[in-house]
Swiss-Prot record:
Cofactor note: Binds a second Mg(2+) ion via substrate during catalysis.
Binding annotation for (2R)-2-phosphoglycerate: 167, 340, 369-370, 391
Lineage, broadest ranks: Bacteria, Pseudomonadati, Pseudomonadota, Gammaproteobacteria, Pseudomonadales
Assigned protein family: Belongs to the enolase family.
Cofactor(s) it depends on: Mg(2+)
Species whose genome carries this gene: Pseudomonas savastanoi pv. phaseolicola (strain 1448A / Race 6) (Pseudomonas syringae pv. phaseolicola (strain 1448A / Race 6))
GO-annotated cellular components: cell surface; extracellular region; phosphopyruvate hydratase complex
Name of this protein: Enolase
Length: 428
């Protein structure tokens, strides 16, 4: 049995130029596992705490030296001599040491970086690909699938400096036969969309997640531009390719109303109907955070209205937290959960959220954050848990493409052992 002989933390930069935490877990046989914690822009109020320094003289207060010190001090002392393969024991030990509900003492970014680095070291120690080790931890050894990518090709909201309210307009290549084919389709549509926007005299600069970030007259104009790009690329909208939205509605929910910059102001019931109408007019098969995280009555209205046919994803709503997810399941709120490592702060708790969702008939979508690094762990998580769907941004920026490239490698390794199920991964 290999043992942990050293743990090192350091401050590195994410894709937005903000500091984040990287950790190395070193084993007695010389193996080193390294991992970085991501960071979000639009965040749920109940996410685990990302520990920042608050020292305005460094990185405008966003430094993470406190989290790094926690890795190099108490976390290192706690885990020296431990078995890296026993992920649950490592994570539970760190959670216990932290002693808070939201990991405010050590920092979720510190705990997560070590948690993922340990998993990578353990995979290497067993001579396993990371996705295979994750499948073992998930209790599903040897069971894999390739995820359908939800490609964010127009960015708005908190992810872009433009006037679009809805945060993400996504495409899914549901008619493709393999992940590689789906990735090619999405890439071709992305390039055709650039041409469509240019022809309309619109900006083709990209947002945090690599999607285009033009100023548009309405959310409808974004959907129309995507439809034109899909057709120009030679694909059929609704069969080859479908649409998805991330409203991030908490960002424009003010005083009990949903306030869109161009379309006006809506009550919860009215906004639920606004979204339902969009699904009737466009092949939108997934809507994330369609209502505010605190508007559970509105969520119930939306779920009852279109939940049988449309995937309704809780991100800010559930924050990868099993306690909150269980409440949602019991109340029949939404039908899907977005899975983000750093919302909960450990690999073990992430796997528990995926397992709970699947047991209740909810889908689970593995997701990046807007502040990413070259770390591609979420690709292995998607395959190793057979999640079926992944959100990792657009078809540019190496912080996004690194995940797609890892999925290409995995599909090449697994071949027919990992099916790409396309439309079957979604409701309706």
């Amino acid at each position: 049995m290999a043992k942990i002989v050293d743990i090192k933390g350091r401050e590195v930069l994410d894709s937005r130029g903000n500091p984040t935490v990287e950790a190395d877990v070193v084993l007695d046989n010389g193996i080193v596992g390294s991992a970085c914690a991501p960071s979000g822009a639009s965040t749920g109020s109940r996410e685990a705490l990302e520990l920042r320094d608050g020292d305005k003289s460094r990185y405008m207060g966003k430094g993470v030296l406190k989290a790094v010190a926690n890795i190099n001090g108490p976390i290192r002392d706690l885990l020296l001599g431990k078995d890296p393969v026993d992920q649950k024991a490592l994570d539970h030990a760190m959670i216990k040491l932290d002693g808070t509900e939201n990991k405010a003492s050590l920092g979720a970014n510190a705990i997560l970086a070590v948690s993922l680095a340990a998993a990578k070291a353990a995979a290497q120690d067993q001579d396993l690909p990371l996705y295979a080790h994750i499948a073992n931890l998930n209790g599903t050894p040897g069971v894999y699938s390739m995820p359908v990518p939800m490609m964010n090709i127009i960015n708005g909201g908190e992810h872009a400096d433009n006037n679009i309210d809805i945060q993400e307009f996504m495409i899914q290549p549901v008619g493709a036969k393999t992940f590689a084919e789906g990735l090619r389709w999405g890439t071709e549509i992305f390039h055709h969309l650039k041409a469509v926007l240019k022809a309309r005299g619109l900006n083709t600069a990209v947002g945090d997640e690599g999607g285009f970030a033009p100023n548009l007259a309405s959310n409808k104009e974004a959907l129309d531009a995507i439809a034109e790009a899909v057709a120009n690329a030679g694909y059929t909208l609704g069969t080859d390719v479908t649409l998805a939205l991330d409203c991030a509605a908490s960002e424009f929910y003010k005083n009990g109303k949903y306030k869109l910059s161009e379309e006006g102001e809506y009550s919860s019931a009215e906004f639920a109907e606004y979204l339902a109408e969009l699904t009737r007019k466009h092949p939108i098969i997934s809507i994330e955070d369609g209502l505010d995280e605190s508007d559970w009555d509105g969520w119930k209205v939306l779920t009852d209205k279109i939940g049988e046919k449309v995937q309704l994803v809780g991100d800010d709503l559930f924050v990868t937290n099993t306690k909150i997810l269980k409440e949602g399941i019991d109340k029949k709120i939404a039908n899907s959960i977005l899975i983000k490592f750093n919302q909960i702060g450990s690999l073990t708790e992430t796997l528990e959220a995926i397992q709970m969702a699947k047991a209740a008939g909810y889908t689970a979508i593995i997701s990046h954050r807007s502040g990413e690094t070259e770390d591609s762990t979420i690709a292995d998580l998607a395959v190793g848990t057979s999640a079926g769907q992944i959100k990792t941004g657009s078809l540019c920026r190496s912080d996004r493409v690194s995940k797609y490239n890892q999925l290409l490698r995995i599909e090449e390794q697994l071949g027919s052992k990992a099916a790409y199920r396309g439309r079957a991964e979604f409701r309706g």
